[in-house]
Amino acid sequence: MNLRRFYPLDGFPRQRQLWSWISFDVANQSFTLIINTLLFSVFFSQVVVQNDAIDDRVWALTYGGSMLLTALLSPLAGAVADERSCKKRFLIASGLMCGVFTCGLGLIQPGQMWLAVLLYLPANFAFSIGENFLASFLPGLAKQDQVGRVSGFSWACAYAAALLLLILTAGAMMVLKLESAEAWRPFFVFAGLWFLAFTIPTALYLHEPQNERAVHPGGNLLTTGFVRLGKTLKDAGRYKDLAYLLGASLFYGTGMSVVVFFASKLAVEYGFEQVDLVIFVAVITLSGIVGTIIPTLYQDKLGHRRSVLIFLAVWLATALGFALYAYLYEAHAAGGSLVKYPTWPLWVIGNLLGFGLGSLGSANRAFVSYLAPPNREAEVFGIWGLMWKLSAIMTFPFAWVKDTMGNTQALLVLAGFLLVGLVLTLRINEKRGHAAAQQS
């Protein structure tokens, strides 16, 4: 039996190059999962802030502040990276910075809100801007009709790593009796060390071609960056389909950010214990692996636009279903019933959320790569990063509505963001956008 036929990248050249790139996707999972999704948001609320009336808003502002910094610097950093051929240096620096500051989160004591903010802000900034530089390598790793497969397989590997992290986390919680949020500091140190370890293959083997263009007059990095960025913005009218895609990313990226940063908090509010919470996130992760299979195997054949629309429709239906569950749960609680409201619908919702998270994230990255002009990849992915980071800042309206009006209304706001993203995606002409990129 030939097992190689089950390997999606079989026959691709530069296998070491591909795996060194995938390694950084795997590194990212420790921060995405342990810090942003599973543990740190709960630790921040229960141990650091210790005030239910403001914890959601403080968390959203802390996270949003780091995203605002990333959003402001992403396009400029991308322009500099393209001009000076320093994408790899920026990528590795971001990995080292994120790993070190993540380890520092293990030092936080109860009530030390400012220390938590001062450690989390640079860690999340480095993690977020590193995602942009990592994605900008994608067009050079595969042919244009293979980027969906590479992106999807890398996301599948990252989700498999996340599943391993979940098993290790759940095992440590049960064996070492670390169920209490105040006992989670060792997990933060572990997350930082994991990030640093998987950055090493990227540092050793990922190759970046050198540009031969002359540096713009003025010479320094800031001048270079602003000149290139200004030219890109001036040419934006030629790439209107890419502009639609980046705009859509802003809105459905908000939905993905809400899931990443509020899924564990919502699950706790609906009666999940800490071990249940780990299993719930494991279910989301497994569904995410399934979600990456479609972009890996079919996106290049099905079409990037059609793939994104399918995944968006699934997410929109899921958000509306979640809002209905929240409404029925609150009505049940208001009725004074002593019978616990069933949680099985949350497991269905979790599966659909995970499917959308894996499939939409991978499909979006590949779609941007398909529409990006050659030799401007880091600039385009810098602007892509700007949209995604702004989408994270847009989680604050969700948090405000959640705190002041309730979960049902907040989830309807989430569905509205996804609907706008779907409408913008419908305006994209995939073939026209790709042709415009190749003519640049």
Task: Provide a role label for each language-model segment.
Residues 2-18, 208-246:
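Juxtamembrane intracellular "pre-TM" segments in multi-pass secondary transporters
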Residues 6-67, 241-248, 252-280:
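Helix-loop boundary and gating motifs at the non-cytosolic
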Residues 72-86, 290-304, 402-403:
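Helix-to-loop junctions at the C-terminal end of transmembrane segments
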Residues 81-95, 300-315:
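Cytoplasmic membrane-interface "Motif A"-like loop-to-helix N-cap segments
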Residues 95-111, 313-339:
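C-terminal ends and interior cores of transmembrane alpha-helices
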Residues 101, 112-130, 333-359:
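Hydrophobic core of transmembrane alpha-helices in multi-pass small-molecule transporters
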Residues 129-142, 359-372:
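Intracellular juxtamembrane helix-capping segments at the cytosolic ends
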Residues 151-172, 385-395:
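Glycine-rich segments within core transmembrane alpha-helices of 12-TM secondary carriers
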